[in-house]
Amino acid sequence: MRPRNNNLNLKFIRIYRWTPSNQAEAKFSVHPIHTSNCGPMILDALIKIKDEQDSSLAFRRSCREGICGSCSMNIDGINTLACLKPIKTNANIITIYPLPHMYIIKDLVPDLSNFFSQYKYIKPWLINNVPKKSEYLQSEKDRSELNGIYECILCACCSASCPSYWWNHDKYLGPAILLQAYRWLADSRDTNAKERLKLLGGKSKLFKCHTIMNCSRTCPKSLNPGKAIASIKHSINYS
């Protein structure tokens, strides 16, 4: 039954709950929040609920400024960051799930072990085989090639919105990791492009992308992983 609400400042936050130690099925808890005494973002509401209503609620958070990517979750059907998502003024009920199609540790906390193992696989660091005694310099033009790529904060919103990643997360690297891979392919200081492309070759790691483009639509940083993936495909097909 939907709670009745005659107060525009009163919102009901409906949160997915599951605890591994409890054999019961997952459930929802509903928490009233007055926006007049709460911060403007969903993360503010979650912190207030944890502090004042239910200390057992589990979720990740850190910077509160859209930089760390910790508070990624599904809010009213969209993968986004709780710290950047305003509390809706035109909705009585806001529903929050963890990132979809991922194993859950507790409540809104997904298990990102596989995600970060894939990140490690692409060798996300500068590889330059030309010895140098000073720093590796980069022109402003070359640096500008990284705009729209390096800003990725590994929140996993895009990967968790990708149907190909849902069904092939053990093989397909997913949009977030492939965007990170392209970040190093596009870096003029890196000399390891050939080996990096070898890591991404084959049918499963890269070519499971079917350009559905959920990744680009959901990215809270307004990046375009789909474009980066297309660039990698072009490099492999025409190298």
From Swiss-Prot:
Residue ranges occupied by any 2Fe-2S ferredoxin-type domain in the UniProt entry: 24-99
GO molecular function, one term: 4 iron, 4 sulfur cluster binding
Pathway: Carbohydrate metabolism; tricarboxylic acid cycle; fumarate from succinate (eukaryal route): step 1/1
Topology versus the membrane: Peripheral membrane protein
GO cellular component entries: mitochondrial inner membrane
Pfam families in alphabetical order: Fer2_3 (PF13085), Fer4_17 (PF13534)
Cofactor note: Binds 1 [2Fe-2S] cluster.
InterPro entries (alphabetical): 2Fe-2S_ferredoxin-like_sf, 2Fe-2S_ferredoxin-type, 2Fe2S_fd_BS, 4Fe4S_Fe-S-bd, 4Fe4S_Fe_S_CS, Beta-grasp_dom_sf, Helical_ferredxn, SDH/FRD_Iron-Sulfur
Residues the record lists as binding [4Fe-4S] cluster: C152, C155, C158, C219
SUPFAM superfamilies xrefs: 2Fe-2S ferredoxin-like, alpha-helical ferredoxin
Gene3D superfamilies cross-referenced by the UniProt entry: 3.10.20.30, Alpha-helical ferredoxin
GO terms under biological process: respiratory electron transport chain; tricarboxylic acid cycle
Catalytic activity: a quinone + succinate = fumarate + a quinol
Positions contributing to [3Fe-4S] cluster binding: C162, C209, C215
Ranges for domain 4Fe-4S ferredoxin-type: 142-172
Main location: mitochondrion
Residues annotated for [2Fe-2S] cluster binding in this entry: C63, C68, C71, C83
Keywords: 2Fe-2S, 3Fe-4S, 4Fe-4S, Electron transport, Iron, Iron-sulfur, Membrane, Metal-binding, Mitochondrion, Mitochondrion inner membrane, Oxidoreductase, Transport, Tricarboxylic acid cycle
Localization: Mitochondrion inner membrane
Documented EC number(s): 1.3.5.1
Binding site for a ubiquinone: W167
CDD domains: fer2
Subunit field text: Component of complex II composed of four subunits: a flavoprotein (FP), an iron-sulfur protein (IP), and a cytochrome b composed of a large and a small subunit.
NCBIfam families for the chain: dhsB, PRK05950.1
Family: Belongs to the succinate dehydrogenase/fumarate reductase iron-sulfur protein family.
The protein, known as: Succinate dehydrogenase [ubiquinone] iron-sulfur subunit
